[in-house]
């Protein structure tokens, strides 16, 4: 869950949200966080009541029947497919930057952008997706170990960023607070919502959790 929430979204979408909301992006994070917290509480309650694998599919099946559960299941497949593509593209930017700065190799734009962005194919994104797929194939223990390491790296990076940024905060940088008004803040909140998504992955482990009625909500 932590690995999914503290992921590509918080690193990549922050710049996009800043363009929409400016300093008001702070309010966007709060709005998106409150909405996600409400959804997360629902997931926690359902996971405690129906402690089996399947997440939203199982909850829909138990409450509304097979047809709705079937629709939710396919919606989840679409969601995870789109999310995997978005995360792969986000990591692609980091891979390209690393290759260009560390090895001084310039990759043609046609090979790092999809057709929608004027390129042919995003090879780094495909490589990232293939690597993650390979980790999942070789075993849960190995992929969990890699995920734990990556979570540690991401949390450390955020902690270092906060420690370095707080001493140089100037209130002049927060004026104007919302250059595009509430419309910009709400648009940024919609983008930032993706950065919080991942709490639903926690509920999938309810069946393997000891005392899920107590531990899942926590």
Positions of predicted regions on the chain:
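Hydrophobic alpha-helical transmembrane segments of multi-pass membrane proteins
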Residues: 2, 30-31, 74-82, 127-134, ...
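Membrane-water interface regions at transmembrane-helix termini and the short interhelical loops
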Residues: 45-47, 71, 75, 114, ...
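Residue-level recognition of pore/gate-forming positions within transmembrane alpha-helices
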Residues: 4, 32-36, 76-77, 151, ...
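Helix-loop-helix junctions that connect adjacent transmembrane segments
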Residues: 25-26, 103-127, 149-218
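Structural signal for membrane-spanning alpha-helices in multi-pass inner-membrane proteins
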Residues: 40, 132-136, 158-165
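The first (N-terminal) embedded transmembrane alpha-helix
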Residues: 1-10
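Extracellular loop-to-transmembrane helix junctions
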Residues: 10-113
């Amino acid at each position: 869950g932590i690995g999914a929430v503290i992921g590509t979204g918080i690193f990549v979408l922050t710049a996009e949200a800043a363009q929409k909301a400016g300093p008001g992006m702070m309010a966007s994070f709060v709005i998106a966080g409150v909405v996600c917290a409400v959804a997360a509480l629902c997931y926690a309650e359902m996971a405690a009541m129906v402690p089996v694998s399947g997440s939203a599919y199982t909850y829909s099946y138990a409450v509304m029947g097979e047809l709705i559960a079937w629709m939710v299941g396919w919606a989840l497949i679409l969601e995870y497919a789109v999310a995997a593509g978005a995360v792969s593209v986000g990591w692609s930017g980091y891979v390209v930057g690393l290759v260009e700065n560390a090895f001084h190799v310039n990759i043609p734009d046609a090979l790092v952008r999809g057709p929608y962005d004027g390129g042919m194919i995003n090879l780094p994104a495909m490589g990232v997706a293939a690597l993650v797929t390979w980790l999942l194939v070789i075993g849960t223990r190995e992929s969990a170990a890699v995920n734990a390491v990556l979570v540690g790296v991401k949390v450390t990076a955020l902690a270092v960023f906060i420690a370095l940024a707080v001493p140089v905060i100037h209130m002049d940088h927060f004026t104007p607070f919302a250059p595009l008004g509430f419309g910009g803040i709400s648009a940024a909140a919609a983008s930032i919502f993706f950065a919080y998504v991942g709490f639903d992955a926690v509920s999938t482990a309810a069946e393997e959790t000891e005392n899920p009625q107590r531990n899942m909500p926590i």
